[in-house]
Amino acid sequence: MFTKTALFVAPLLALTACASSMAPAPTFSQAGMPAAVQVPAGHKVAMEAVGVGQITYECRARKDMAGHEWVFVGPDAKLMSRSGQVVGAYYGPPATWESNDGSKLTGTQLAVAPAGAGDIPLQLVKTQTAVGMGAMQGVTYIQRVATRGGVAPTMPCDGAKQGTKQIVNYQADYIFWKAI
């Protein structure tokens, strides 16, 4: 009888230990965020990732005035867990976040707020389309925070350089939110 009980209880204890060691989903206070990029109430963090990659800019003629400017073309980044594992990718256009599990979403920028000098702005994105079952399923907002680098090149952009592309490195935290 003791052997049968031990064989039944041991796996239950192991499962209980595993369950109690799982960390709860992180919570991120919106209090320190600029109002423009705060996620609306009624949402919880579903996932977080660190985007590490490049942003491409192209020297183009200005649309509404004379001269040229560096124009954002798109990102190409790996999405990493806090432990350094690649969990997905971020690319565009259109802005697309794709999980290694095959789920992905596209989004539209709602707002930006200034970040530090030399850093791309903080950003709030609303999900437009989502496909696949997995990590991206049910995500309604994406917040870009803790940005480093990624701003347009400082080198001159003129008619002689029109069509030239420059790639700059960047890093940012992406916080994925779901409705409660």
Regions found by a protein language model. Name each.
Residues S21-M22:
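Non-globular disordered terminal and juxtamembrane segments underlying protein topogenesis/assembly
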Residues A25-T56, K63-I180:
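Primary mode marks residue(s) on the alpha4-beta5-alpha5 output face of response regulator receiver
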